[in-house]
Amino acid sequence: MSNTIETESMDEMFKDPAPVIANPESVIVELQRGLLNPATGQWQTTAEVRELNGKDEEFLASLEGNKNITYAMYVGTIVSRATVRIGDTLIKNNKSVIDELITGDRDTLLVAILRATYGPERTFKYPCEACKTSNDVTINIEEDFPIQTTTFNLREPFDVTLKKGEVLKFKLPVGSDNIAMSKGESIAQQSTLLISRCVVWKDHKDSLYSEEWAKNLGLQDRNTILSAILGPKVGPKLGEVNTQCATCSADIVINVDWVSLLLA
């Protein structure tokens, strides 16, 4: 019996400790427009995001073969999975509220998710077109994506004056508008969808005919409206990354997007 006890004691000594699963890294960020809490009528602007993990990667990979998933929907899914809260709204139980954010706020969350996942810098490989050598390219997440701000009121409908002097109110597009627009089969159809969703009618009945109304607008009025609703630039500026090849010194220009930055 004593031998059994000794053996059990030795087994206990050499057992590997149970792995400790660390809490995911989180980042706090301020949004410019934020999310309206319908219960309080207050705008919530403080958001918390976490790093992307293997579960997120597997889920997102499962969407890649789905032809019905647009880029806007895919990016929205990334944000809804990695955003913990906006104000006191927990996103895990209210994922659809991400579609109520303007594009600039959504992109601000994406930069925060990038920082939570990779730290202050993101390094990835990119081939040189001149010599075909693979280069390690490092992006400084804070410096390379400067946050644009505006004095424009991002929360209230605004006036747009049409060609014949008619004044109509419009709102800024949010995620759900961008998702609906992305399903248009042409740029013209996408413009129609966006205009029809952003016009603010005094009478709710008029909204039933918004798409047909948008189709019947003259091109000058359509362009005026699109310039107005897409005009305010807020959030991180996503553009080109310029570097040089470490082997042949040729200039390398990289057009980055959020999906490749986060998952490539």
PLM regions: where:
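Short, surface-exposed, charged amphipathic helix/loop patches that serve as local interaction elements
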Residues: S2-A264
